[in-house]
Amino acid sequence: MMTEWLGLPALAATHGGQIDNLIGWIHVFMLILFVGWGGFFVYTLIRFRKSRHPVANYTGVTSSASKYSEIAVAVIEAVLLVGFAIPIWAARVDRVPPESEALVVQVTAEQFAWNVRYAGPDGVFGRTDITMIDAQANPLGLDRSDPAAKDDVTTLNQLYLPVNKPIIVKLRAKDVIHSFGVPEFRVKQDAIPGFTIPVYFVPDVTTAEMRTRTGNPEFQYEIACAQLCGLGHYRMRGFVTVQTAEEFQTWMDAEQETLKGEAGGSDIFR
């Protein structure tokens, strides 16, 4: 009800309910303030109109009501911050599960694309070398001669995830500040050059299920860059496909077969 009333996107991550609850309470508080202060403003316009008070009163307010109301507002804001916002943020930052229990994905932002990399079956990300970066063929500078890199899977603007699996996105940027945001996951985090920032969430609705829920057969989870990053910012879009564990494994196996074919037909791994 609250989600629909506020116009929030459909929820598709386990932690999103807490965030939606916080957003709802903030809006309730804002509504109370709006009605309260708006009513008080109208009251003062009528109560102290010129026809009733032709001579200015220089004494000022003698009641303590305004002081107590301001204290009450400050207390409520503190409760929202300490009781809701900080615990939710701590859960996102301090309670990230061990990487052994999650799917770890590297997402590197650049003008104007999202470069996605999976470690492959060995669970180890291969070596990268900035001298090997090629804007078209190798945007990450992945060194395929490194044994750990032979099974690394890379995609452009496409993030594939298994449902109900803890996900840790290691977010980086090659050039300027970008911002990784997926509204349905209630996730948004700046990508800053020189930093690797972990983003943790658990998607709990597959893309197919969301298409059924929304009645939109073309629905896709979209990665939107929420930070103005240059002239091409408007086209920096990526997409997330949430699959069942079996579907994700089938996709990963197909990618591994493709890598083996490329290794046999070229010197990409030599």
Q: Which residues fall in each region the model found?
A:
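Non-transmembrane, membrane-proximal soluble domains of secreted or membrane proteins
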Residues: M2-I23, L45-R270
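Central hydrophobic cores of alpha-helical transmembrane segments in multi-pass inner-membrane proteins
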Residues: G36-T44
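Alpha-helical transmembrane segments
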Residues: I23-G36
